[in-house]
């Protein structure tokens, strides 16, 4: 997903684990959707969503999904004081950031179009949720729960029993928080 000029990797970051929210699951699902369609496009396969600009690159997005990425203005709003769910779409590392070469000409129009799609689609989904969407949001969590649980098991494989149990308690607390956040968007 790195642009030719900046050689950066595109990332979809969600808020901190302390304020985990279903909006992050939606952002991750959209990243997977865009990754899949742009990979198909780059492979020369038919897709309804090429998400390519005539002036931009044709490579797949290959967006990485991650928890909170600190170091920008959104940190204040995502922190525990405000606790606002955030999705941060960004390139990192970007060799030109905060230099004299940090100019619009170094932004790949295709990557910008794809980022705009993810942001606009997430906003439209969140704004359009109805009482009947609760089960859909719960099912959206499934693949990410499996992925996160697998990552945790690998990360804690060499820990002692007590430390591993503590990590699992923290993990399931976060997953429960995400599940509970659905009621903020879909009351029933």
Regions found by a protein language model. Name each.
Residues 1-188:
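Secretory-pathway/membrane protein signature
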């Amino acid at each position: 997903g790195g642009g030719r000029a900046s050689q950066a990797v595109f990332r979809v970051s969600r808020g901190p684990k302390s304020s985990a929210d279903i909006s992050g699951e939606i952002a991750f699902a959209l990243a997977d959707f865009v990754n899949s369609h742009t990979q198909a496009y780059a492979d020369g396969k038919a897709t309804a969503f090429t998400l390519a600009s005539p002036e931009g690159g044709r490579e797949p997005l290959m967006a990485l999904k991650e928890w909170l990425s600190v170091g920008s203005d959104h940190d204040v709003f995502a922190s525990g004081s405000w606790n606002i769910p955030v999705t941060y779409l960004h390139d990192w590392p970007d060799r030109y950031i905060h230099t004299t070469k940090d100019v619009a000409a170094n932004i790949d129009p295709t990557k910008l179009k794809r980022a705009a799609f993810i942001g606009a689609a997430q906003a439209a989904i969140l704004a359009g949720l109805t009482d009947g969407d609760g089960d859909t949001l719960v099912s959206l969590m499934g693949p990410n729960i499996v992925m996160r649980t697998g990552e945790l098991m690998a990360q804690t494989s060499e820990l002692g029993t007590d430390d591993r149990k503590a990590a699992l308690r923290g993990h399931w607390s976060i997953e429960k928080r995400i599940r509970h956040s659905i009621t903020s968007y879909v009351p029933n």
